[in-house]
């Protein structure tokens, strides 16, 4: 029988049905059937490409067809009954009507008047299954008889609560307290009278149904039905095991119609679910919750599943325990009577015993049998073996080398048997203890295995090993790691942090395919006055080939004074050898070697992204751990990483929404993702590509598109190469002339002429305030958010327009985050109402106070709530005036992406309290408010490159990104442009006056900006250069006179050269993305700055290099850039397949290019072995080589 035809033939003629009596989920089921069987399976979450001979076995596909055939029968019957009632049809009280409806009952595949068998059903090939399953009276029991107050509701009459395992299979109370809706005797077929004593009579007065046998509940009556008779026939001891049977089937893990969960104590563990996951998946896919389904319909589903799991349940449930008195278990018989020569024979024997066809077993069933086989074999050989048998098997295609064994194997294990295990079992991975013959003590370790990562947990849920596909022999963990997840609770008594797994063993469940698992602690708060449960799920992400951890905390006593504060995943004991490294996402990214400690609040300059990595080195065969929060909405969180003596730890802390407030349930709204990645010295790059896959696919901030797709990134802005600022000092030390319009006009004109290129001016100290007296001027970091009018009044606008005519684009400074408590606006607009309040961990988060900040100016600030409408409007007013009144082309709004969020617990603020993603949405709304005033084409930029603001912010001042050294044990790596290249604009670094006196460090900073794709400069023109106010920690910033000196001619020419080269390579450096770096031989020499009163004193490399991919991914450029004015020669080696695996086995064309349009072809080379010899650099120049990938 063709399954497609079977499903299609069951659809009947539905066009005349009245579907008004069906609920939403039921109408979806019928409508999907009308579209055809494959459309229906798509609704079921199976997918449109399901075929019996591909990813589903024929047996599983028939199960789906039969289940949905039964569903359709039920729904059609309900709709037709509704149609009859609406046509004033007589009550269904005669045999003919009953027979008519009986023909529609769910399991009647043939003549309704005859007993139904499953002989024609290819699924019913288990022993003894050719027996009557359902009689018409049972169908009427499902549908209602039309004579009770509930009958008009049909299948929807019963209480839509969850199934009660202690009730009968179809029993359960109604919403009015009545028993299940059962037909009256007159609704039976002619032999119904013999069954009359089993049926309740309606009591119109009470609306309840009475029982005709004293005190016997409705579920006992059902044992006299044909269904119960079938169960008795199949299982003579059914009365004694019914409750256990029903309970077990509710716990069964159901995959495509085949049971593959094994009971606790044998080869797996159980999970508690009110309905089979098949039903959950079925209706979750169409957006319908199970409680909205008719309870009888759900129960019919589950009853059908129960019956077809029966034979499998006999096989799996408790069959590996010790023999019980009076009967021998399957496991005992296997050990005593059978010698299993190979896994194949074992599987064949099991299939023959239960009439299962080996070739049609689902993958999950094969894996389950493999696990059972190993248990049996292990018990038979345990007395002769010691240690632990560890079996690591690759994916179903066996793409990796068959490196299977680790540890001690049973002596009789044969090589051909192991190869059979690979073939039959596919991608499974598990450990079995072989040091005991006590089968009840066998505790299978939970092991999740993908083609890239194998993660092993012991019986307590502790991480015991973490290894990658490159070598199963390498364990990235130095020790077993327990207490890797913690929950921080607050009560009236104080704060408690519970770390798990600990001595409290969880209940656990492994999925059928062996790649997902769940740990549950019903109560983690022993010894406390609260009752809190925790569930952790690790699920395999197929796209990323990684594991995603999800957490759910339940408060079983919501009225108790207890609340949740934060959740933390802390992976300790990560092996980081001396030659290994770690990555932390500050700025563009920092690579650490050796001991270190780093932390950052996300989103901020200290944690611009949400991922870390650690490991690498020869001992790890280049592999490391990737840990990330794959959160596409930007929830507030905290990242921490450290390493001591070759052991690293990585942790992510999630501040929960409404932290400290009463709660019933809290689910982490994003997964924490962990995986093993390769990469060796460039471990950071491979980890970055995994994060890039997530970000491009799920992150909200990617929706604005690439640079050329955005209106707020005009062409002149992308093409800009050099930035200057009017004068800035890191400790707010300014002289009087730095922001004066007359001074700014004069010095900017001359610098523009000196560099002979367009540039952007970041203008500080432009504000005056309402008092025109110089002594009353609003100085830097005072009076925020009050700025206007500007210094010089209308003359400020005149200077702006004059400079813009000469090719200088003006970006005045404002602050978007802090509120001066001494400002006029704070006093006039109840400033405290618009500011954030912090809370110490406490129940109710009642202990609140303002965040207080102060900088070099001495003013006191509170942090404004970015979601506050007043704050958004006030900032938009200022930007409106600057653009539309004074003519600036862009505005710099400080701190938005640099400063850490200040979680807010103010009760009347319109966002979640404490945790949440409101910080991102608030800042995005600030920018939206500004754009409503100035239009979409004005660049609005801020400090630092925090990812979640990319869709709103036009560019980022990258001071923090370029703060680390470029080589050494704490070095900048361009992870951010490796992920987001082509989607953002970065500009700027801190340059000191000392850098111009010692020109090589300045040139190193400029070259770093160039090779990493940023716009150059941010040279500070004004500043205090002498006297007691000179900044001795950050260095002198006033550089104008030095730039204009003849002694700087060479360095000016070099900066101009790299600025022009950047414009020439914009299609790569701005619109493309950076790849893994090339290798230079010999390694460039390193040097330190002569002057040390600067933030980055080195070490600096004498040359830097990079590979950039074009946006169309058809070519790349290899850049080698000189820092020193002395000659240097290098050989360059590039393996493009490391970054672009699609180029494997490809030949590429390499040519040296120049910006004058001339190029010289070098050779055709393998993409994985590009060699360019004798690359000579002189006079701080660069060599550029274009690589064409070809067809």
From Swiss-Prot:
It comes from the Eukaryota. Residues 173-187 have a biased composition (Low complexity). Residues 173-221 are annotated as: Disordered. Keywords: Glycosidase, Hydrolase. It is an enzyme of class 3 (hydrolase). GO terms for molecular function: hydrolase activity, acting on glycosyl bonds. The lineage of its organism: Eukaryota, Choanoflagellata, Craspedida, Salpingoecidae, Monosiga. It holds the Pfam family DUF6259. Its EC number is 3.2.1.-. Belongs to the glycoside hydrolase-like 3 (GHL3) family. This is Putative glycoside hydrolase 22789.
């Amino acid at each position: 029988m063709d399954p497609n035809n079977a499903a299609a033939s069951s659809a009947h003629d539905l066009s005349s049905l009245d579907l008004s009596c069906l609920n939403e989920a039921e109408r979806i089921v019928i409508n999907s059937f009308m579209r055809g069987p494959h459309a229906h399976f798509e609704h079921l979450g199976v997918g449109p490409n399901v075929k019996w001979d591909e990813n589903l076995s024929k047996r599983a596909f028939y199960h789906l067809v039969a289940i949905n055939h039964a569903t359709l029968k039920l729904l059609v019957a309900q709709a037709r009954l509704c149609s009859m009632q609406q046509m004033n049809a007589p009550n269904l009280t005669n045999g003919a009507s009953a027979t008519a409806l009986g023909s529609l009952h769910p399991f009647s595949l043939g003549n309704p008047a005859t007993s139904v068998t499953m002989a024609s059903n290819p699924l019913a090939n288990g022993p003894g299954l050719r027996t009557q399953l359902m009689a018409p009276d049972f169908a009427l029991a499902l549908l209602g008889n039309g004579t009770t107050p509930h009958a008009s509701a049909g299948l929807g009459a019963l209480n839509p609560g969850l199934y009660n395992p202690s009730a009968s299979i179809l029993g359960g109370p109604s919403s009015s307290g009545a028993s299940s809706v059962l037909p009256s005797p007159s609704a039976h077929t002619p032999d119904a009278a013999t069954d009359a004593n089993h049926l309740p009579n309606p009591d119109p007065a009470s609306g309840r149904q009475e029982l005709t046998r004293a005190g016997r509940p409705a579920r006992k009556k059902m044992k006299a039905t044909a269904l119960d008779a079938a169960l008795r026939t199949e299982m003579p001891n059914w009365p004694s095991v019914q409750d256990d049977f029903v309970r077990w089937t509710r716990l069964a893990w159901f995959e495509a119609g085949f049971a593959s969960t094994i009971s606790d104590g044998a080869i797996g563990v159980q999970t508690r679910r009110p309905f089979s996951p098949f039903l959950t998946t079925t209706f979750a896919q169409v957006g319908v919750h199970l409680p909205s389904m008719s309870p009888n319909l759900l129960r019919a589903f589950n009853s059908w599943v129960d019956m077809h799991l029966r034979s499998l349940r006999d096989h799996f449930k408790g069959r590996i325990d010790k023999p019980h008195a009076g009967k021998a278990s399957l496991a005992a018989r296997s050990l005593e009577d059978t010698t299993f020569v190979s896994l194949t024979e074992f599987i064949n024997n099991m299939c023959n015993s239960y009439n299962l066809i080996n070739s049609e077993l689902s993958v999950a069933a094969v894996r389950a049998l493999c696990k059972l086989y190993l248990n049996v074999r292990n018990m038979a050989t345990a007395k002769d073996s010691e240690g632990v048998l560890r079996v690591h098997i690759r994916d179903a295609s066996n793409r990796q080398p068959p490196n299977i064994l680790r540890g001690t194997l049973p002596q009789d294990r044969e090589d051909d048997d192991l190869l059979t295990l690979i073939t039959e079992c596919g991608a499974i991975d598990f450990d079995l203890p072989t040091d005991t013959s006590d089968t009840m003590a066998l505790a299978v370790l939970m092991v999740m295995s993908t083609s890239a990562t194998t993660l092993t947990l012991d019986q307590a849920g502790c991480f015991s090993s973490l290894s990658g596909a490159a070598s199963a022999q390498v364990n990235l963990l130095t020790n077993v790691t327990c207490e890797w997840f913690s929950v921080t609770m607050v009560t009236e008594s104080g704060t408690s942090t519970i770390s798990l797994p600990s001595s409290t063993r969880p209940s656990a469940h492994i999925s059928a395919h062996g790649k997902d698992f769940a740990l549950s602690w019903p109560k983690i708060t022993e010894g406390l006055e609260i009752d809190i449960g925790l569930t952790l799920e690790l699920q395999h992400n197929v796209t990323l080939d990684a594991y995603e951890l999800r957490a759910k905390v339940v408060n079983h006593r919501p009225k108790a004074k207890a609340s949740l504060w934060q959740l933390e995943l802390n992976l300790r004991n990560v092996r980081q050898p001396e030659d290994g490294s770690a990555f932390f996402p500050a700025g563009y990214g920092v690579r650490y070697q050796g001991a270190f400690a780093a932390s950052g609040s996300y989103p901020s300059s200290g944690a611009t992204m949400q991922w870390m990595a650690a490991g690498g080195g020869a001992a790890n065969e280049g592999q490391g751990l990737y840990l990330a929060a794959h959160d596409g909405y930007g929830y507030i969180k905290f990242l921490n990483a450290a390493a001591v003596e070759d052991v690293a730890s990585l942790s992510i802390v999630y501040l929960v929404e409404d932290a400290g407030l009463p709660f019933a349930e809290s689910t982490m709204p994003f997964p924490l993702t962990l995986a093993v990645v390769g990469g060796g010295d460039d471990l950071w790059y491979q980890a970055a590509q995994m994060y890039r896959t997530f970000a491009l696919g799920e992150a909200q901030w990617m929706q604005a598109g690439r640079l050329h797709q955005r209106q707020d990134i005009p062409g002149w802005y992308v093409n800009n190469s050099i930035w200057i600022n009017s004068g800035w000092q890191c400790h707010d030390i300014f002289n009087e002339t730095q922001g004066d319009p007359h001074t700014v006009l004069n010095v900017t004109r001359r610098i523009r002429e000196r560099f002979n290129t367009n540039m952007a001016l970041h203008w500080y100290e432009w504000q005056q305030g309402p008092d025109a007296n110089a002594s009353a001027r609003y100085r830097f970091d005072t009076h925020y958010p009050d700025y206007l009018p500007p210094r010089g009044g209308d003359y400020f606008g005149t200077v702006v327009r004059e400079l813009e005519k000469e090719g200088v684009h003006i970006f005045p400074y404002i602050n978007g985050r802090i509120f001066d408590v001494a400002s006029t606006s704070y006093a006039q607009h109840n400033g405290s109402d618009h500011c954030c309040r912090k809370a110490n961990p406490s129940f109710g988060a009642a202990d609140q106070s303002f965040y207080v900040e102060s900088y070099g100016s001495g003013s006191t600030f509170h942090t404004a709530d970015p979601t506050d409408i007043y704050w958004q409007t006030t900032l938009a007013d200022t930007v409106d005036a600057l653009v539309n009144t004074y003519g600036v082309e862009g505005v710099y709004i400080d701190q938005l992406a640099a400063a850490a969020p200040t979680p807010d617990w103010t009760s009347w603020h319109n966002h979640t309290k404490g945790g949440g993603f409101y910080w991102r949405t608030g800042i995005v709304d600030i920018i939206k408010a500004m754009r409503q005033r100035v239009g979409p084409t004005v660049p609005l930029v801020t400090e630092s490159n925090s990812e979640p603001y990319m869709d709103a912010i036009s560019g980022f001042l990258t001071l923090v990104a370029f703060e680390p050294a470029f080589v050494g044990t704490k070095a900048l790596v361009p992870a951010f442009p490796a992920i987001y290249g082509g989607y953002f604009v970065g500009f700027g670094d801190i340059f000191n006056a000392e850098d111009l006196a010692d020109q090589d460090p300045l040139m190193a900073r400029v070259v770093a900006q160039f090779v990493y794709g940023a716009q150059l400069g941010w040279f500070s023109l004004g500043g205090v250069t002498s006297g007691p106010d000179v900044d001795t920690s950050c260095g002198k910033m006033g550089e104008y006179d030095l730039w204009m000196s003849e002694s700087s001619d060479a360095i000016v020419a070099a900066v101009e050269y790299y600025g022009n080269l950047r414009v020439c390579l914009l299609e790569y450096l701005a619109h493309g993305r950076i790849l893994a770096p090339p290798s230079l031989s010999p390694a460039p020499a390193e040097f330190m700055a002569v002057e040390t009163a600067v933030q980055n004193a080195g070490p600096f490399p004498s040359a830097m290099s990079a590979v950039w991919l074009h946006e169309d991914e058809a070519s790349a450029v290899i850049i080698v850039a000189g820092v020193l004015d002395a000659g240097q020669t290098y050989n360059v080696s590039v393996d493009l397949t490391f970054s672009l695996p699609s180029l494997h086995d490809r030949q590429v064309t390499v040519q040296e290019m120049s910006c004058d349009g001339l190029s010289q072809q070098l050779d055709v080379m393998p993409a994985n072995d590009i060699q360019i010899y004798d690359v000579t650099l002189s006079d701080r120049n660069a060599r550029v080589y274009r690589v064409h990938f070809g067809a």
